[in-house]
UniProtKB/Swiss-Prot annotation:
GTP binds at residues 19-26, 81-85, 136-139. It comes from Chromohalobacter salexigens (strain ATCC BAA-138 / DSM 3043 / CIP 106854 / NCIMB 13768 / 1H11). Disulfide bonds: none annotated. Belongs to the TRAFAC class translation factor GTPase superfamily. Classic translation factor GTPase family. EF-Tu/EF-1A subfamily. It catalyses: GTP + H2O = GDP + phosphate + H(+). Keywords: Cytoplasm, Elongation factor, GTP-binding, Hydrolase, Magnesium, Metal-binding, Nucleotide-binding, Protein biosynthesis. InterPro entries: EF-Tu_GTP-bd, EF-Tu_GTPase, EFTu-like_2, EFTU_2, G_TR_CS, P-loop_NTPase, Small_GTP-bd, T_Tr_GTP-bd_dom. The gene is tuf. This is Elongation factor Tu. Monomer. It is found in: Cytoplasm. Residues 81-84 are annotated as: G3. It comes from the Bacteria. Residues 19-26 are annotated as: G1. Its main location: cytoplasm.
């Protein structure tokens, strides 16, 4: 049987369900596929096939994730759903499932619970741009005032973590009803269809990598006699053209130079684009002025920093991580893009130690500056062995 052709003409958006255990994330995920399939065709997924998500290894971390897809008028959605709370934590911190927006599922019968809060906090820390809310199990609540109260609580919680709680769309309904193809008082299929409309309206289309300012992590440096210095790497975003000025950022003082040529597979090109492995010839740059771990970037678009707040997941013993906890003053290496830099960890007040398998907010001070911005992912390593994964939540200096 021939594979169905992937529709390129619709914008592609990555989303995921977040929220407290048993509030209906997986049921809603299944309902979304059903409601969308009935309008736009495509397959709909049964609850069980999503709930028994296969485990994947992402950078040595075991994460169980279900991937489903569905469509709306304008868009093609790729949606991730995780069976367990720990899987969410790992997924969001490693960026294994990059989300352009999240669907927060909250039971109208229970209101916000501890993981509701934790997932909103995580979304803030890892830079999920937007949240749309589905108040689930509304068919179990007879009291209109109670629904309004829960909605108010959710909005306050979003505001608390710097999301625009007053403007976030909140759709009220029953995922189970929609999954069973029912629609009493518009709470089933209609509510889920409205949720899809809210995703369309409220989650902005992400800027494609090619349209962002140029950045290339430097992997290798060569000196070619008579030509100068060539740096190689994979262009992370943007385009670099021959003749353009770039900055070399990180590890040392920022330096400006000009790209006098771009090569790929030993052929000269006019430009290097996001996703391509290229060599860039730099004018007047000595072999010793550049090193692996720095980045080549469009001038003024990224700056070097040494102190930042991060959200870190510490690998469990089973994942090949540490067997023992660590304490404040812990000094591992932080692997950014292509290189390790040693740094010291400061733990939040009241946190004395961090156990393998935990996630923790920490402030890190590096011994050398790295080109960084909020949302940058890194690995925590000890002598080349990965013991954690993290994301820059906020740059301090």
């Amino acid at each position: 049987m021939a594979k169905e052709k992937f529709e390129r003409n619709k914008a592609h958006i990555n989303v995921g369900t977040i929220g407290h255990v048993d509030h209906g994330k997986t049921t809603l995920t299944a309902a979304l596929t059903r409601v969308s399939a009935e309008v736009f065709g495509g397959d709909w997924r049964e609850f069980d096939t999503i709930d028994n998500a296969p485990e994947e290894r992402e950078r040595g971390i075991t994460i169980a994730t279900a991937h489903v897809e569905y469509q709306s008028e304008e868009r093609h959605y790729a949606h991730v759903d995780c069976p367990g709370h720990a899987d969410y934590v790992k997924n969001m911190i490693t960026g294994a499932a990059q989300m352009d927006g999240a669907i927060l599922v909250c039971s109208a019968a229970d209101g916000p619970m501890p993981q509701t809060r934790e997932h909103i906090l995580l979304s803030r820390q890892v830079g999920v741009p937007t949240i749309v809310v589905f108040l689930n199990k509304a068919d179990m609540v007879d009291d209109e005032e109670l629904l309004e109260l829960v909605e108010m609580e959710v909005r306050e919680l979003l505001n608390e973590y710097d999301f625009p709680g007053d403007d976030c769309p909140i759709i009220t309904g029953s995922a189970l009803m929609a999954l069973e193809g029912k629609d009493d008082n518009g709470m089933g299929t209609t509510a889920v269809a409205n949720l899809i409309k809210a995703l369309d309206a409220y989650i902005p289309e992400p800027e494609r990598a090619i349209d962002q300012p140029f950045l290339m992590p430097i992997e290798d440096v060569f000196s070619i006699s008579g030509r100068g210095t060539v740096v190689t790497g994979r262009v992370e975003r943007g385009i670099v053209k021959s003749g353009e000025e770039v900055e070399i950022v990180g590890l040392k003082d920022t330096a400006k130079t000009t790209v006098t040529g771009v090569e790929m597979f030993r052929k000269l090109l006019d430009e290097g684009r996001a996703g391509e492995n290229i060599g860039a010839l730099l004018r007047g740059t000595k072999r010793d002025d550049v090193e692996r771990g720095q980045v080549l970037a469009k001038p003024g678009t990224i700056t070097p920093h040494t102190v930042f707040e991060a959200e870190v997941y510490v690998l469990s013993k089973e994942e090949g991580g540490r067997h023992t906890p660590f304490f404040k003053g812990y000094r591992p290496q932080f692997y950014f893009r292509t290189t390790d830099v040693t740094g010291t960890c400061e733990l939040p007040e009241g946190v004395e130690m961090v156990m393998p398998g935990d996630n923790v907010k920490m402030t890190v001070t590096l011994i050398a500056p790295i080109a960084m911005e909020d949302g940058l992912r890194f690995a925590v390593r000890e002598g080349g062995r990965t013991v954690g994964a993290g994301v820059v939540a906020k740059i301090v200096q």
